[in-house]
Amino acid sequence: MTAGSGIIHQEMPKGDPAGRMHGFQLWANLPASLKMTAPRYQEVNSPDIPQVTDDDGTHVRVVCGNFWGATGPVDGIAADPIYLDVSVPAGKRKALPVDTTRHAFAYVFAGSGKFCNASDPLAVPTEPVSWADTRPPAEADNRALVLFDRGDEVMVQAGDDGIRFLLVSGRPLEEPVAWYGPIVMNTQQQLQQAFEELERGTFLRR
């Protein structure tokens, strides 16, 4: 979804027979020149997402961008992201190429592993952890966000149960961000104006 000049939306995802599913929401900022672009929505079904498999059993589903010769179905995003769903088998060590001009992060949602040359802190838990947690800081497991310094590859060593993570990279916009709740602008003045329009019922531009 591209929010552009404004959109009100609702998604009703459908999981497996038990109602379970993985759900992720990634916000990619629009440059100031495109903030008021027309909103649009893309629906992509799972069978439409290409998967490539390496000789060591590593699976990569390409949601957006180009990777290992496959092109993802999601397009037209200004930050030009590469959005990958990566599964590395247990005990395998894998190097994944990344463009040096991009910022990159990984979000682990199954298994565990160790990432090399990540920024400090190496792994940022996205849920509270116990004060008695003694796991070494290099271990990134379920619901951990891993931030990377710039480089030309991401190196991961999968744990005993393998590891599955989202690997996302994009071109930095180098613009100020003003964000509150569901609205992202470039200045506080723009943000205030957007909420005033929302209150008046003039937020949506048809």
Predicted regions: what is each one?
Residues M1-R206:
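Jelly-roll (double-stranded beta-helix
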